[in-house]
């Protein structure tokens, strides 16, 4: 329940700041919202809650003013802890602002000069992509042993995140070539 409230709260806050999100991140946050709504329906059949109830519960639990995100580092850390339970940091990944800019040069990928920098970026992206593919494979194996529906939903969500991130990285690699 606590992680569902947190996910509902974070998704709502991210969607309120839509102008700061790129399209891919916005789609990931929408998927997280859909996944969280599904969790709300399945987590307790005796006391069903709505999306708004989950957000209100999280706000009350944290005593957070809805107009500020002063406690954002704590929210981020708690969400990462939920992800660490699966030994994967892919739950937080969609909420990081994924932009198509190089941290080194702050240039658009198409304007990065040919040479060593572009080669290093491509090499790192391919390494990240291969690790995400391995994570996706491990998550697909983990699904077989799951007996808890909440864990199953979380693993399926994380597999979707992995697949979408892999597609974004491959698209970025193609734009660099």
Swiss-Prot record:
* Regions that span the bilayer: none
Pfam families referenced in this protein's UniProt entry, alphabetically: Flu_C_NS2
Annotated motif Nuclear export signal, positions? 91-100, 117-127
Swiss-Prot/TrEMBL keywords: Host nucleus, Host-virus interaction, Transport, Virion
Compartments, as annotated in UniProt: Virion; Host nucleus
Coiled-coil annotated spans: none
On assembly, the entry states: Binds M1 protein. May interact with human nucleoporins and exportin XPO1/CRM1.
Q: What is this protein called?
A: Nuclear export protein
Q: Which organism is it from?
A: Influenza C virus (strain C/Johannesburg/1/1966)
Q: Gene of origin?
A: NS
